[in-house]
């Protein structure tokens, strides 16, 4: 049962169009970083409880995964050292403590942070595959709505 507890979260995060999926991924040689950020009130209470995530309109879940392979083709999940931080438009920053979550062969890195209504955040992620892959850095911007 616990093995499939993350499945509803993954379905939610993957319910995006192919164009959005390409916008939420970046290729670095033999590796692809997939990333997303969503308000935690999208999570079911069970998923939030299982992963110690507070459900709230004012909290955002950042998810990152690193795959070995080509963008648009199913790749092999790779463990990585992942760090991240956020910055709002007034340059207030917060370091995230990305924690690893494994579900079968899938490997994800997650953390949450607080936002206010209509706040735009820059999210900076650095990932280094433990199998010797390159250090990869991405930045994405997203506006969050809490009302």
Predicted features and spans:
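Bacterial N-terminal signal peptides
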Residues: 5-16
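Beta-strand-rich structural segments
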Residues: 60-70
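Short amphipathic beta-strand segments in non-cytosolic proteins
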Residues: 83-95
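Aromatic sugar-binding surface patches on proteins
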Residues: 103-110
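Short, aromatic- and glycine-rich surface loops/edge beta-strands on solvent-exposed regions
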Residues: 121-128
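Short acidic/polar inter-strand loop motif in beta-rich domains
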Residues: 129-136
């Amino acid at each position: 049962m616990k093995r499939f507890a993350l499945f509803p979260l993954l379905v939610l995060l993957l319910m995006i169009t192919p164009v959005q999926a390409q916008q939420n991924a970046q290729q670095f040689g033999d590796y692809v970083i997939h990333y997303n950020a969503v308000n935690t009130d999208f999570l079911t209470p069970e998923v939030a409880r299982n992963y110690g995530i507070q459900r709230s309109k004012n909290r955002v879940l950042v998810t990152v995964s690193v795959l070995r392979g080509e963008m648009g083709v199913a790749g092999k999940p790779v463990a990585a050292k992942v760090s991240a931080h956020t910055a709002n438009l007034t340059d207030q920053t917060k370091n995230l403590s990305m924690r690893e979550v494994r579900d079968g062969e899938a490997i994800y890195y997650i953390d949450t942070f607080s936002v206010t209504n209509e706040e735009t955040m820059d999210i900076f992620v650095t990932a280094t595959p433990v199998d010797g892959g390159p250090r990869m850095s991405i930045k994405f911007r997203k506006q969050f709505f809490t009302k």
